[in-house]
């Protein structure tokens, strides 16, 4: 380790901090100033980093450069990464990260381009979440996730778009994944489609379909979630087929933004469980008052071939 630095009561200037490790070298140059706001400027360089000996199950060879600057003042912050480059390989998978971005505590972001690549898999983010306008795209194209991370497998492809304005944002999503595996969990297919807008009230639709969820003692053939409508009138349907639990429910409701009150009805609800089938004998009325942090649940009964469980209004 070698260190070259100087400073005073107002700032510290780190001319060079060099750490020789992992068969390579890491070098940091930085300036930290606190005269008025806390501000920083830094440059981190990775040269010939090799983790094969220390982490044989996760061998990596990396080179890179990360430049950053920013400030923190009065509970607000801003930061910029004018240069981000990382190259090399991880477990024989090529690694490439390249991009620039800047943002602040008001969640305003400008991303001219951020590209991530691991083997045949890639993801890209580009656009801005501005003071007024929103125009951001995020894409993923991962045809070969097998062993990209230990225990991971499958494919994924999708697109997320943010459009509109800060006053009336719109979110569109279309994502598909197949043959997903993580350790002992496997999922044959996942599909997510959504189009959500927010103007004077939130409205849109969301469809989620998940097929063949498997792990020890769990085998779910199909899960579907469908939601649509607006704040004033919306509905949701959930269906589950599999073991040890299967079933369905419908939820319909309306939200009064002025009163901060949501009223709804839970209906068409039944489940098959290890202790037999259970079903509602009547719809359940639900009433949530956000100002009072209070929820009321109407009286209802759950029916089983061998029992009936009734709950008074709560």
Locate the predicted segments by residue:
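Interface amphipathic segments
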Residues: 1-314
């Amino acid at each position: 380790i070698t260190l070259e630095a100087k400073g005073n009561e107002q700032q510290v200037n780190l001319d060079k901090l060099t750490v020789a490790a992992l068969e390579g070298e890491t070098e940091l140059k930085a300036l930290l100033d606190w005269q008025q706001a806390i501000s920083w400027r830094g440059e981190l360089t990775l040269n010939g980093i090799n983790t094969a000996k220390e982490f044989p199950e996760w061998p990596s060879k990396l080179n890179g450069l990360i430049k950053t600057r920013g400030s923190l003042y009065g509970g607000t912050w801003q930061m910029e990464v004018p240069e981000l480059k990382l190259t090399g390989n991880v477990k024989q998978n090529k690694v490439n990260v390249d991009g620039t971005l800047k943002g602040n505590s008001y969640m305003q972001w400008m991303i001219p381009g951020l590209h991530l690549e691991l083997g045949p898999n890639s993801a890209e983010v580009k656009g801005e979440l501005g003071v007024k306008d929103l125009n951001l795209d995020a894409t993923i194209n991962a045809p070969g996730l097998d062993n990209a991370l230990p225990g991971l497998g499958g494919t994924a492809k999708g697109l997320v778009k943010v459009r509109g304005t800060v006053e009336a944002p719109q979110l569109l999503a279309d994502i598909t994944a197949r043959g997903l595996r993580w350790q002992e969990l496997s999922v044959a297919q996942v599909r997510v489609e959504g189009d959500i807008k927010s103007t004077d009230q939130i409205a849109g639709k969301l469809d989620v379909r998940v097929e063949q969820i498997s792990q020890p003692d769990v085998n779910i053939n199909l899960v579907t979630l469908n939601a649509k409508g607006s704040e004033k009138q919306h509905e949701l349907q959930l269906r589950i087929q599999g073991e040890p639990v299967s079933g369905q429910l419908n939820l319909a409701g309306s939200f009064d933004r002025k009163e901060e009150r949501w009223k709804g009805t839970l209906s068409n609800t039944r489940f098959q469980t290890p202790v037999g089938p259970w079903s509602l004998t009547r719809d359940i009325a639900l009433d949530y008052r956000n100002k009072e942090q209070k929820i009321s649940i109407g009286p209802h009964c759950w029916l089983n071939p061998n029992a009936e469980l009734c709950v008074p209004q709560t």
